[in-house]
Structures are given as structure tokens and as C-alpha cells.
Amino acid sequence: QVLLVLTERKTRYEIVSKIKSKSQYCVVKELDKIERKMGAKKFRETFKTITCDNGCENLDFEGIERSAVVKRKRTKVFYAHPYSAWERGSNENANKLIRRFIPKGSDIGKFSHERIKMIEHWINNYPRRLFNGLSSDLLIKRMYVA
């Protein structure tokens, strides 16, 4: 099992999901699930673009872009250049925060869904210097109220 981590660009809000395998099918299936939970419009507004690394699990760009709910694209996919992690800097920082709880190379299967959601909650409520001590959770709530 592996983690799928989505980072919202403006607020750095994280969605962390455990998926069965590092496969194109599992990535698209989880994005479909997230889109259904959020609603097509909110997903499209939140994740206008998704920048992926070049892992084989991210190669189904049509599946990633295609909405599971409406007959239009849900997002636009871009790929970072090989060995250019800085092109996905916010996501890499989120991965660093996740590693406080789950060291790199750990068996993700040993972590419950509840534990993964607790980590997600901790990250989203962590005060950020970038936001003058405000959390991503607070900022995304403000964004959707406005």
C-alpha cells in the first residue's frame, strides 16, 4: 500500500489517502472517490492543475484529468521534470511532514485509515509561517466561505 498526497496550491491544504498499490488504476480510482466526496465543482476549483512526478502510477493523464461525475475535465495534469523535486515543492514539504509520523520505507499497510486521517488533520492544522501562523485548514475554510 502507498499514500496518495494532494496539495492545494494556495492554502497548502493536504488530502492524504492510503491506496492499495502504486498503480494507475488505484490513483485514478482514489481521485474519483475524492472528487465524488468533494463534488465535481469544488474539486475542479480546488485542483485546477495537478503536478505529478514521472512515476508509472501517474502516467494515465487522461484518467487523472477526466471527471468521474460530469462530462468535462476535472483538472489539468502537468509532469515535473525528472530529478526536479523543487517543481513540486509544496507537495515535497507535505511529504516531509508525513515522514514525522511515517518514516520513508515504512509499510503503509500497518497504518490504519484513522491514523492516516489523524496525520492529515495534524498537517492541516499546523501553524504555517508562510501564513503568519494560520493553518491550512483555517485558510481553506475562509476560501470557501468567501
Question: Where does each model-flagged region fall?
Answer:
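Active-site beta-loop-alpha junctions of metal-dependent nucleic acid enzymes
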Residues: 16-41
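Short acidic/glycine-rich loop or secondary-structure boundary segments that cap or lie
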Residues: 1, 14, 25-26, 58-61
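Short conserved beta-strand segments at catalytic cores or DNA/RNA-binding microdomains
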Residues: 1-15, 20, 31
